[in-house]
C-alpha cells in the first residue's frame, strides 16, 4: 500500500452498495467527516463548504505529488488541484446530494459528523501550509491547538461573531436542499468555546439554525 494514497471507499461506492445496505436492514447511514481535509480521518477540516473530492469525485487531476524529501505542502500541486479546483468540489457536492437522495428514497436517514470545536492547519482561513492563492495565512504561534495538537487549531468563537455566523450557516446548509441531511453528530461538543456558558449558548443557537 502506498502511504501517500487515501485508504478506504468513496461516496460512489456507497451509492453502488445501496441495495446491499437495504437488504441488511440499514435505517441510518452515519458518515465520519466528509469535508475537504488532508487526512484519512478528516477531523482536521480544511473547507466546510465542500465534500472532499478524494471521497467524492475528481474530474480534474493536474499537477504532481509532493517530491521525495520536500516537506513544504505548497509544492503538492496535485493535491492542491484536487481540493481547490471548483469542478472537483462542485462535482463532489453533487454526488453527495445524490447519495442522500437515494438513501431517502429507500427510507434511510443520513447523519453527518460535525467537527466545529477545531479545524485543521490546512484550513483556508489560516492556510498554514500556503496552498491557497492570495490567502493571508497566519502569524506563527498565533493559535492554540486542541489538546496541544498544532494540526487542530481550536476555533475562537468568542472572538469572532463572523466565525459563529459562518459555522451556523454551514450547519444549516447541509440539512437544507439540495443536500437534505437528517442530522448532525457533533464531535467533542463539550469542548467548544472557552467557557461552559458560551458552550451552552452556541449549541442553543446551533439547534435553532438546524431545526
What are these regions (language model features)?
Residues 1-211:
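Active-site and adjacent substrate-binding regions of carbohydrate-active enzymes
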